[in-house]
């Protein structure tokens, strides 16, 4: 406990490039741990329970994750930008941001639930149940809050906090699953949701405690609520546009695969795509850490960019090599057909870590220097080009064509980002 307290109570000292790298490692490790533990959760659920129960629960969890992407509204990114500009008011800004996060998540979840029983049944089955709807609302709030807390930890230079919260989430979710299995072998779909709710509560409680002991006492008098809210929303919405432009292809490509090649092909594509995104989280997390460092110092430091790039390439490159080597084994866990159809796809997608590193460093610098709309344009063009190229090549060559189309767009974006980043650093 003493060691854990030391992790979260180090005084808030804004950081040079080496601390940016340390924070990036914590963020990347936390996000990767979250996805890895989530994979194990679903693997265990598939072993313990019927496909109907697992499928219905997965539909609701996927719907929740979609809601969290919209419900963030860039609030966490706004904190990364605004905290360095409002010294002495960090505690106040974080409090206001978290309250807005709760309100926004509830609003998005209610809108989603209000879409109608037909759509929701397609997403998860038994969502018409009031209990399932209530659990869904809680999951959306906790899931969105946890994402904003991750970004807040980056703003404070405390990447280790992210790892602690995500490991706690995974452990509690696993214990909840085992508890449900001990009680009954034939639970209702809504029962598994409570394992996620319990995990979300644990992660958020830990996060609140971390911020309580980490954030310095407020100084400089009482902060105007309207001013804080205006700064958070003004900065946040611009960052949200970039985030949505960047993440939209992850949601669109599986849908396109179904339309072009059919559901069977998508069954092989989706696990390969998710494995690739575990890798992509590494440069994305490091880019977020660079964003925090640039926003703090209000200038682009070559040493910070070089350190972040080196960290991303070392960790992401090592992980990519590991995935390339173990691709067949990883997919074989799901079944022989998955390994046969998806091994080459995973290997090609894994190579995307290298050009994506340049793109994410560029995005991080753009976020930190108020060049949001420039980066948003690049992300939108890259995403549209990636989906278009993947669709054209996929229709002719199947899943490997989808992978080649996506990789080509990522590589082109990486080249542009490298050139543009070089120009920005020379100014």
Language-model segments: which ranges?
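Interfacial segments at transmembrane-helix termini and the short loops linking adjacent helices
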Residues: 117-136, 263-264, 325-357
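Signature of the first transmembrane helix
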Residues: 3-6, 18-76, 237-263, 379, ...
């Amino acid at each position: 406990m003493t060691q854990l307290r030391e992790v979260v109570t180090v005084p808030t000292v804004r950081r040079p490039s080496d601390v940016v790298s340390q924070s990036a490692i914590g963020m990347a490790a936390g996000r990767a741990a979250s996805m890895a533990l989530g994979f194990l959760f679903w693997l265990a659920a598939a072993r313990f329970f019927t496909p109907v129960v697992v499928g219905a629960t997965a539909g609701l969890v996927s719907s929740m994750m979609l809601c969290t992407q919209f419900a963030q509204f860039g609030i966490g990114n706004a904190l990364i930008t605004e905290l360095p500009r409002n010294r002495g008011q960090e505690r106040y800004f974080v409090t206001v941001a978290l309250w807005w996060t709760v309100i926004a998540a509830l609003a998005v979840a209610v809108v989603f639930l209000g879409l109608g029983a037909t759509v929701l049944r397609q997403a998860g089955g038994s969502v018409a149940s009031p209990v399932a709807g209530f659990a869904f609302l809680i999951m959306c709030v906790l899931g969105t809050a946890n994402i904003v807390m991750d970004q807040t930890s980056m703003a404070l230079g405390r990447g280790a906090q992210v790892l602690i919260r995500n490991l706690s989430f995974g452990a509690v979710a696993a214990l909840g699953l085992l508890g449900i299995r001990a009680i009954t072998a034939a639970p209702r779909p809504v029962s598994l949701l409570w394992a996620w709710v319990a995990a979300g509560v644990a992660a958020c409680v830990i996060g609140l405690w971390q911020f309580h002991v980490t954030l310095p006492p407020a100084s400089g008098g009482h902060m105007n609520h309207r001013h804080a809210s205006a700064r958070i929303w003004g900065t946040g919405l611009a960052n949200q546009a970039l985030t949505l432009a960047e993440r939209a292809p992850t949601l669109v490509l599986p849908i396109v695969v179904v339309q072009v090649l059919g559901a069977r092909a998508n069954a092989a594509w989706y696990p390969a795509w998710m494995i690739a995104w575990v890798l992509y989280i590494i440069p994305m997390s490091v880019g977020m850490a660079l964003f925090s460092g640039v926003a703090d110092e209000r200038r682009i430091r070559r040493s910070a960019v070089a350190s972040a790039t080196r960290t991303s390439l070392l960790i992401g490159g090592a992980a990519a090599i590991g995935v390339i080597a173990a691709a067949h084994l990883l997919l074989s866990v799901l079944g022989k057909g998955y390994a046969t159809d998806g091994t080459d796809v995973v290997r090609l997608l894994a190579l995307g870590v290298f050009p994506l590193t340049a793109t994410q460093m560029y995005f991080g610098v753009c976020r930190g220097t108020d060049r949001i709309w420039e980066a948003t344009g690049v992300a939108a063009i890259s995403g549209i080009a990636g989906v278009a190229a993947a669709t054209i090549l996929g229709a002719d060559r199947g899943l490997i064509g989808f992978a080649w189309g996506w990789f080509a767009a990522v590589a082109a974006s990486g080249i542009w980002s490298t050139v543009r980043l070089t120009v920005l650093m020379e100014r």
